[in-house]
From Swiss-Prot:
The lineage of its organism: Eukaryota, Metazoa, Chordata, Craniata, Vertebrata. A zinc finger (TRAF-type) spans 150-202, 203-259. GO terms for molecular function: histone deacetylase binding; identical protein binding; protein kinase B binding; signaling adaptor activity; tumor necrosis factor receptor binding; ubiquitin conjugating enzyme binding; ubiquitin protein ligase activity; ubiquitin-protein transferase activity. Pfam families: TRAF-mep_MATH, TRAF6_Z2, zf-C3HC4_2, zf-TRAF. Belongs to the TNF receptor-associated factor family. A subfamily. This is TNF receptor-associated factor 6. Pathway: Protein modification; protein ubiquitination. One of its GO terms (cellular component) is cytosol.
Length: 522
């Protein structure tokens, strides 16, 4: 560590009858074998080809033996169970029968409870090993029942819904259907290039705004969206009313004949116009005149309101400017008072100041990201009267030469209230300490003592609020040492500075601390 002068800041089965003990033993012996040979999902085949509450509705080859038929649904046993009276049923069928028809066997009406049913794994394995035909039309594949579901998932003859028209088609044909035959396949309009469904293309063609159409009057070919303007403004043979139709002329003619009509009927048109003007002059209190007067009165009222609103806006603007000036003065007063309070607090330190640096984890993260971290403490006084000082903490970057990942700590002199009454340059001893915040009886603080060097600029009377020259340690403490003890608590680092001027320097030496040798400052 070196002391340097620094430059500017950087439902199981419960009972069985005797007649079923042998069968139960046989079933349990077959359970392990069946669980290995079968597929776990085969017992609950997809409902796409059979109902969950009934047996297997598939075609067996050879045909299914009657001993494997459920007496209730008359299909192959699904999840076969056996009763104490020796009959076999689909598990779902017999449970539904017991709950709906009562606690009795459907075959012999013997008393039967649900907890008396036990799985017939022997029959289940036998049934799952039977050969069945694929139920999809056109597929000739045969397989064991246990493999039917897997086959169904990949069978090219299985029916799937077209994603466009929702109609079912066999899987091998669906792609051809989507591309060539589907009425909802997307096709491009030859005129506007818009994508439309094939079955809607005819309707789109009849309304496409860019389709070519022929004018019914002059046979000119235009695109559809231009046709309305063509009819209203350009078509030479479109029928239009006379310009004086409002005044009583009811003639209609082709647009290219309008000029001749106006020329030939000038006198009659003038008579119509004169009659219309004369009629208006005879009705001074007509609805139009009354409406105009109402509009004029409304406009006059609105103009008056507008003037009043303008006056109010001007008054409010003037008041706002006055208030803004007043608020600015209050803010300046508050800042002045805050500075005075801070100055008074700084004077109460009597040479011992503890600097609390919060959010220190954020500063460490910035240092790891190689962002410069330089923090200044508030000012504090060595006494009253006394010198005003502050501390500067600098987290050196990982790439810094000779001081990488170190905490640098410096002291700066500041302009204070008593500078004119104090001897300069500053002379005294400064103890810098990073406090151990652990709960241990004996705390191991990290501290250093340095003597002021009056010949350095760092201890001359400052000519600006804070002396840019500082004095302290470039390698005060390594960041690894900072993490080894509880120097950081609640994301806060505590730095203590104790200053003894030349009037009370003996106190530090009596405690046994001797200042370390220093390097010449810049």
């Amino acid at each position: 560590m070196s002391l340097l002068n620094c430059e500017n800041s950087c439902g199981s089965s419960q009972s069985e009858s005797d007649c079923c003990v042998a069968m139960a033993s046989s079933c349990s012996a077959a359970t392990k074998d069946d669980s290995v040979g079968g597929t776990a999902s085969t017992g609950n085949l997809s409902s796409s080809f059979m109902e969950d509450i009934q047996g297997y509705d598939v075609e067996f080859d050879p045909p299914l033996e009657s001993k494997y038929e459920c007496p209730i649904c008359l299909m192959a046993l699904r999840e076969a169970v056996q009763t104490p009276c020796g009959h076999r049923f689909c598990k779902a069928c017999i449970i539904k029968s017991i709950r709906d028809a009562g606690h009795k066997c459907p075959v012999d009406n013997e008393i039967l409870l649900e907890n008396q049913l036990f799985p017939d794994n022997f029959a289940k394995r036998e049934i799952l090993s039977l050969m069945v035909k694929c139920p999809n039309e056109g597929c000739l594949h045969k397989m064991e029942l246990r493999h039917l579901e897997d086959h169904q998932a990949h069978c090219e003859f299985a029916l799937v819904d077209c994603p466009q028209c929702q109609r079912p088609f066999q899987k091998f044909h669906i792609n051809i259907h989507i591309l060539k035959d589907c009425p909802r396949r997307q096709v491009s309009c030859d005129n506007c290039a818009a994508l439309v469904a094939f079955e809607d293309k005819e309707i789109h063609d009849q309304n496409c705004p860019l389709a070519n159409v022929i004018c019914e009057y002059c046979n000119t070919i235009l695109i559809r969206e231009q046709m309305p303007n063509h009819y209203d403004l350009d078509c030479p043979t479109a029928p239009i009313p006379c310009t004086f139709s409002t005044f009583g002329c009811h003639e209609k003619m082709q647009r290219n004949h309008l000029a001749r009509h106006l020329q030939e009927n000038t006198q009659s048109h003038m008579r119509m116009l004169a009659q219309a003007v004369h009629s208006l002059s005879l009705i001074p209190d007509s609805g139009y005149v009354s409406e105009v007067r109402n509009f004029q009165e409304t406009i006059h009222q609105l103009e008056g309101r507008l003037v009043r609103q303008d006056h109010q806006i001007r008054e409010l603007t003037a008041k706002m400017e006055t208030q803004s000036t007043y608020v600015s003065e209050l803010k300046r007063t508050i800042r002045t008072l805050e500075d005075k309070v801070a100055e008074i607090e700084a004077q109460q330190c009597n040479g011992i100041y503890i600097w609390k640096i919060g959010n220190f984890g954020m500063h460490l993260k910035c240092q790891e990201e190689e962002k410069p971290v330089v923090i200044h403490s508030p000012g504090f006084y060595t006494g009253k009267p006394g010198y005003k000082l502050c501390m500067r903490l600098h987290l050196q970057l990982p790439t810094a030469q000779r001081c990488a990942n170190y905490i640098s700590l410096f002291v700066h002199t500041m302009q204070g209230e008593y500078d004119s009454h104090l001897p300069w340059p500053f002379q005294g001893t400064i103890r810098l300490t990073i406090l151990d915040q652990s709960e241990a009886p004996v705390r191991q603080n990290h501290e250093e003592i340095m003597d002021a060097k009056p010949d350095l600029l760092a201890f001359q009377r400052p000519t600006i609020p804070r002396n840019p020259k500082g004095f302290g340690y470039v390698t005060f403490m390594h960041l690894e040492a900072l993490r080894q003890r509880t120097f950081i608590k609640d994301d806060t680092l505590l730095v203590r500075c104790e200053v003894s001027t030349r009037f009370d320097m003996g106190s530090l030496r009596r405690e046994g601390f001797q200042p370390r040798s220093t390097d010449s400052g810049v």
